[in-house]
Amino acid sequence: MNRKKTRELTMKLLFQMAINKEKADVIISNLKENIEMEQGSQKNSISQIYGENMGDLKNIDIDYVVRVLRGIEKNEDMLNIEIEKYLRNWKLNRLSKVDSAILKICTYEFLHEDDIPEKVSINEAIELAKKYSSEKSASFINGVLGNMIKDEKIKK
């Protein structure tokens, strides 16, 4: 499984949920439908559906995507509160939807994905921010997440 591509797809789907105000189960259903189409005779280009360089979905950890999207949706209020504790002079609703999605995924991983080291989560979050947001956002996200893991309360 390719964790980097999996996280990237998860971020794109979480962004889609925020922009379209869709529920996780709708997004997951659409994803599974696209996987079935890719495996069947109606082969679609996953790159066309989910963006450049996604390749096919056989290297994506679909269980992770489903677990994280549902987990973020279920725990969104708690995640928002947790993230806002570390936003100095900012509110979560002022951040871009991309930055917000990246922070939610990483915070969810800190709290619920015991097999993922915190530093790996942070590095992947920074790379996503560099690719989909800005260098400034990457530094900002690094600072927020770095402060989070310094706080004993957030640690697993």
Curated annotation (Swiss-Prot):
The keyword NAD does not apply. GO terms for cellular component: cytosol. Keywords: RNA-binding, Transcription, Transcription antitermination, Transcription regulation. GO terms for biological process: DNA-templated transcription termination; transcription antitermination. SUPFAM superfamilies: NusB-like. One of its GO terms (molecular function) is RNA binding. InterPro entries: NusB-like_sf, NusB_fam, NusB_RsmB_TIM44. Belongs to the NusB family. Involved in transcription antitermination. Required for transcription of ribosomal RNA (rRNA) genes. Binds specifically to the boxA antiterminator sequence of the ribosomal RNA (rrn) operons. This is Transcription antitermination protein NusB. The lineage of its organism: Bacteria, Bacillati, Bacillota, Clostridia, Eubacteriales.
